[in-house]
Amino acid sequence: MKIRNILGLSAVAVALGVGLTACGSKNNSQSSNDAKTQTLNLAASTRLDTIDISKAGGYGSTGNVYESFYRLGEKGSITPGLATKGYSSKDGKTWTFKLRDAKFSDGSPITANDFVYSWRRTVTPSTKAQYAYLFNAVKNGDAIRSGKMNPDKLGIEAVDKHTVKIHLTKPVAYFKTLMAYPLFGPQSEAAVKKYGDKYGTNSKYMVYSGPFKMINWNGTGDKWAYVKNNQYWDKKVVKLNRINYSLVSNPATSLNLYNQGSIDITPLATDQLKNYQNDPNLKDYSYSMISYLRYNFNDKDAQKKAIINNDNIRRAISLSINRSVLSQKVLYLKSDPITGFVPKGLARDPETGKDFADQQGVKDTLDYNPKLAKQLWNKGLKELGVKNISLNLLTSNENANSTVATQYLKEQLESNLSGLTLNLTSVPSKIASQREQSGDFDISLDTWGGDFNDPITFLQIPQRGTSYNYGKYNSKKYNDLVNQAENVDANDASKRWQDLVNASKELNLTQGVSPLFQDDTYYLKQPKVEGVIHNTAGTQWNYKYTYIK
């Protein structure tokens, strides 16, 4: 999941899908009323840009209004969704799903054809779906996405009204988990045609398949709400009647509203967290999210391109950063020291149960070693035939955390690497993202959050040809290892795992990206709120079983 606000609380809140209600203090009678009406009040740090599942840039909370074959339960478990069962062929290349009797929020039946239509719509190039690459393993998905084949050739078919069959080009180890992602859910062709260009631009121009449906969102507004979807197949277990959201971009304002009782959950900025360490309502609702330095290997400036493509220069930059100080003293994070591009807690070895993050580390890559850094730096300067280097670090200006982190990086790098000038370029997150996509940067401070609980959700990002590989990192060894994992060894869990471990080690050795820290996010939650399901990847917030006591 690409986090638009490059580092910072706003980015985290967007990823986590937190949302909110109107300002003002609540008394006990109002809190009691929330219990009677089963109303949850949340804060959103940024406006929604779309509710079209084909075009969305993330699905942190939209799993509450959309549903696929499965949905994520506690600790990333796969729980029933629109399918009553799903099974694969012996070679892992064919999946069959049996659908339950279910309806969209407008009362129309959800059928196998709605899945077929949805998938075809998403991979159609003109849709410009950000996550279309996740369909590459579906037969003809890559060819369709690149405009070489018609969408009706996609490897998905409606065998009958309640049976969907999917044909893959290779086994996908995490396919079942992927099928819990709203991206792969059904869309009503009738609704898309009815609303035309308006589809997904307003809450009333959409039909919903999840526990809730959205109301009062006009595409740009500061307030919207989820209300119980009375057409939902499992509506009997849904206790909340309404979830109110309001835009509150300032962390201090959000915290004040929480303390007044106006909102029920609020994220804490780093400068706020230190004052709530012992609060009984403090909750660790972290996301599998890595903040890292992205290098532009295809820099438009020829001299800078040569600098960035020098292995010694990149390793020197990485070894000059004291990550422990940055995460624990500067940003007040509690997460373990980072070991590579895959965060801790995302995935475990299928044989030993060991965390992937404990296996990917490589000495003298992410350590703080200023002595070795200087040696490599001087070697790189000599190879380049220069004595001084000036590079620009691109970041977002939409949160104070970004400013703090980049100032620390500038101080560390310039003090440890003689001849380096690091210029900070701080712009709105939307502009930063546009500049990355157009290749208009030297180095950027970026963030990625896991879409599902498998290392590939991170390791596919620096792979050649991936749409999010804005820096154009291209290592033959790295690409070969990832391809080996996803093709030759795709049906052998142990071999695939080792391929990915080796790929992550190669990424460390080459510093194709320089991981900085794993974000951890703490929230305050009102004790009256129960049943919130939180996951570290994918659809992070599940309010299906939430209630106000």
Question: What is the meaning of each model-derived region?
Answer:
Residues 219-221, 370-450, 521:
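Ligand/substrate-recognition segments at binding pockets and active sites
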Residues 132-190:
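Surface-exposed binding/hinge segments that line
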